[in-house]
């Protein structure tokens, strides 16, 4: 058994461009925040190790580009994911409306029993908020998916979002899945990244 961790979970952040996926990842992995917006090109990832119920869990969190032109690259990353976090911007009605489309992408590309979490980001922008918490919560409940509102800027619920996801995956896997059980499926495909070098600047 690898002494460094008991579990390795691969998580995926998806959602429209500009909803704050990269900011959530930066806040959780590095506890930093930046106001400057640089759109993710293709796929990026960070790793953070957490403790949960006395177990060490290594989270490999993949941040995907929201733009349509990267969809063929990012879709290949759904396959090995244990958990997928769908992010929308509480100040952007369109990003919330598109959640259904993102959920369809999960159904199309991810494994059948993948864990899902719905996150409404930018909750600090209270005066600009257009997506009601109750509406989103009812929608998430109808799907049986956990829901949280977060703010990467002031760190509200960011830790909780990733910890919730890790706990849900661990619960689904059960005690017998530690270490060896899931790891063979976690070989990361390097091939899908190659199209990114094909001139989409």
Curated annotation (Swiss-Prot):
It is a lipid-anchor. Switch 1, switch 2 and the interswitch regions are characteristic of Rab GTPases and mediate the interactions with Rab downstream effectors. The switch regions undergo conformational changes upon nucleotide binding which drives interaction with specific sets of effector proteins, with most effectors only binding to GTP-bound Rab. Prenylated; by GGTase II, only after interaction of the substrate with Rab escort protein 1 (REP1). Its EC number is 3.6.5.2. GTP binds at residues 17-23, 33-36, 39-40, 66, 121-122, 124, 151-153. The modification Cysteine methyl ester is found at residue 201. SMART domains: ARF (SM00177), RAB (SM00175), RAN (SM00176), RAS (SM00173), RHO (SM00174). Residues 174-201 are annotated as: Disordered. The keyword Transferase does not apply. Its cofactor is Mg(2+). It is an enzyme of class 3 (hydrolase). It comes from Mus musculus (Mouse). This is Ras-related protein Rab-1B. Interacts with MICAL1 and MICAL2. Interacts (GTP-bound form) with MICALCL, MICAL1 and MILCAL3. Interacts with GDI1; the interaction requires the GDP-bound state. Interacts with CHM/REP1; the interaction requires the GDP-bound form and is necessary for prenylation by GGTase II. Interacts with RabGAP TBC1D20. Interacts (in GDP-bound form) with lipid phosphatase MTMR6 (via GRAM domain); the interaction regulates MTMR6 recruitment to the endoplasmic reticulum-Golgi intermediate compartment. Interacts (in GDP-bound form) with lipid phosphatase MTMR7. A motif (Switch 1) lies at residues 30-45. A lipid is attached at residues 200-201 (S-geranylgeranyl cysteine). GO terms for biological process: autophagy; endoplasmic reticulum to Golgi vesicle-mediated transport; Golgi organization; positive regulation of glycoprotein metabolic process; protein transport; regulation of autophagosome assembly; virion assembly. Mg(2+) binds at residues 22, 40, 63.
């Amino acid at each position: 058994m690898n002494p460094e961790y008991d579990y390795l979970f691969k998580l995926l952040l998806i959602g429209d461009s500009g909803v704050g996926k990269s900011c959530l990842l930066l806040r959780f992995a590095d506890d930093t925040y930046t106001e400057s917006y640089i759109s993710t090109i293709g796929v990026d990832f960070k790793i953070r190790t957490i403790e949960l119920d006395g177990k060490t869990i290594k989270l490999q969190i993949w941040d995907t580009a929201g733009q349509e032109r990267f969809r063929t690259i990012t879709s290949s990353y759904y396959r090995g994911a244990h958990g997928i976090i769908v992010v929308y911007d509480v100040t952007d009605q369109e990003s919330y409306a598109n959640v259904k489309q993102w959920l369809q992408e999960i159904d199309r590309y991810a494994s059948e029993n993948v864990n899902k979490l719905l996150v409404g980001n930018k909750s600090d922008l209270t005066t600009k908020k257009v997506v009601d918490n109750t509406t989103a919560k009812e929608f998430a409940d109808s799907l049986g998916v956990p829901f949280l509102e977060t703010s990467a800027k002031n760190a509200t619920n960011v830790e909780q979002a990733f910890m919730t996801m890790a706990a849900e995956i661990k619960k689904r896997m059960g005690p017998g899945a530690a270490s060896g059980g899931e790891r063979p499926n976690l070989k990361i495909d390097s091939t899908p990244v190659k199209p990114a070098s094909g001139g989409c600047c």
